[in-house]
Amino acid sequence: MPHQLLINGELVSGEGEKQPVYNPATGEVILEIAEASPAQVDAAVRAADRAFAEWGQTTPKARAELLLTLADVIEENAQTFAELESQNCGKPLHCALNDEIPAIVDVFRFFAGAARCLNGLAAGEYLEGHTSMIRRDPVGVVASIAPWNYPLMMAAWKLAPALAAGNCVVIKPSEITPLTALKLAEFAKDIFPPGVLNVLFGRGKTVGDPLTGHEKVRMVSLTGSIATGEHIIQHTAPSIKRTHMELGGKAPVIVFDDADLDAVVEGVRTFGFYNAGQDCTAACRIYAQKGIYDALVEKLGAAVASLKTGSPNDESTELGPLSSQAHLERVTKAVEEAKALGHINVVTGGQKLDGAGYYFAPTLLAGAKQEDAIVQREVFGPVVSMTVFDDEEQVLAWANDTQYGLASSVWTKDVGRAHRLSARLQYGCTWVNTHFMLVSEMPHGGQKRSGYGKDMSLYGLEDYTVIRHIMVKH
């Protein structure tokens, strides 16, 4: 079982306090891992800083070859990574193996190629006797903080563009789900030069704060909660570090009277509840037009009730447990508060499940109002709300009336309406007649309190660079 840190090309045990790592399907402790000590955090950052002097000057081809090697290793060890992810996160094993690992491999391969296409946009004589050039250079040492919902995938989203651009990275996975990142460290040790990639373990207060606040760290990339994002922005402000924030969402799913209801039902059944709803783009906030609202409630209620919750090792399991006991309690509280409102109708689910593990029943709540907390706040669990709307202007206003701005979807046969809504929705991504689809070539990132900066795509690669102007007199 992986339990060591990667610092300056060496696997070492943590010197800090031991923390338990749980299997959320059973509630049992898998193992205890020692956190990085303050001295080890400092050593990792300084190793990255030393390595940057050479790594930042390597050719894109050289960096690409190592990223491709890492992609191959992950692919060759897909079963191992999937089993660790399933055990540590509670994900159905078949989802981790068949959905997530191939996407992770693709991210590394995409950025390996993208590294060789990065260039400046201008070169020429803008002043007589002088030639100007634009360079895109690496930032330096990047501190990356990965979340617990997709531990290895989010690590890939952060590592691939940062390394491709020529940065050196110190990454801290969530202390709840560290196993796949620590396993990745075991392979990365023999691929990258010492110090280029460092992997730490520990809590935010004990490891995250000294890491993100370190004087040698020039950029911090976070996928996490708004509260964590606020803390890191404030914590790093005195040193004026670049920050890259993906901070969650509450995706509106706008369903018009002319929508294909069967497609909507299948889309929400799948993408409202994938990963037990622990996804910042989950289709969790449905607005259904009044002409089809009742029919959609009935159809979707039956579909959600048919979802199978069970052991992650069962091929027929569609939903595993939530990530932790604390998160189970948060989701339970949010649903109980919604149920206490007289106008909320629990169509199906609405409670935690008996037995071992952190399981919550797939839940559909109808009759929600725009001002309800269940509509306004991210639950991050297998919980979907439904609200009826009258017309296009009303639903546009409601969809945008939130602190979040990550993802949204519009379901209609009217192409003009789809374009109108897409142009006015205040979200980083809007899908039309689908939801949740992501590809390495297209950017992912939010607006408003969902954060800023892009993951994936060439835009994501550019976020890990600095633009520099070089002027030569001749």
Curated annotation (Swiss-Prot):
Pathway: Amine and polyamine degradation; putrescine degradation; 4-aminobutanoate from 4-aminobutanal: step 1/1; Amino-acid degradation. PROSITE patterns: ALDEHYDE_DEHYDR_GLU. The keyword Oxidoreductase applies. The active site is at E246, C280 (nucleophile). CDD domains: ALDH_ABALDH-YdcW. GO terms for molecular function: aminobutyraldehyde dehydrogenase (NAD+) activity; NAD binding. It catalyses: 4-aminobutanal + NAD(+) + H2O = 4-aminobutanoate + NADH + 2 H(+); 5-aminopentanal + NAD(+) + H2O = 5-aminopentanoate + NADH + 2 H(+). It is an enzyme of class 1 (oxidoreductase). NAD(+) binds at A146, P147, W148, K172, P173, S174, E175, D209, S225, I226, A227, T228, C280. Pfam families: Aldedh. Keywords: NAD, Oxidoreductase. Its EC number is 1.2.1.19, 1.2.1.-. InterPro entries: Ald_DH/histidinol_DH, Ald_DH_C, Ald_DH_CS_GLU, Ald_DH_N, Aldehyde_DH_dom, Aminobutyraldehyde_DH, PatD. One of its GO terms (biological process) is putrescine catabolic process. Homotetramer. Belongs to the aldehyde dehydrogenase family. Gamma-aminobutyraldehyde dehydrogenase subfamily. Catalyzes the oxidation 4-aminobutanal (gamma-aminobutyraldehyde) to 4-aminobutanoate (gamma-aminobutyrate or GABA). This is the second step in one of two pathways for putrescine degradation, where putrescine is converted into 4-aminobutanoate via 4-aminobutanal. Also functions as a 5-aminopentanal dehydrogenase in a a L-lysine degradation pathway to succinate that proceeds via cadaverine, glutarate and L-2-hydroxyglutarate. 4-aminobutanal can spontaneously cyclize to 1-pyrroline, and 5-aminopentanal to 1-piperideine. This is Gamma-aminobutyraldehyde dehydrogenase. The gene is patD.
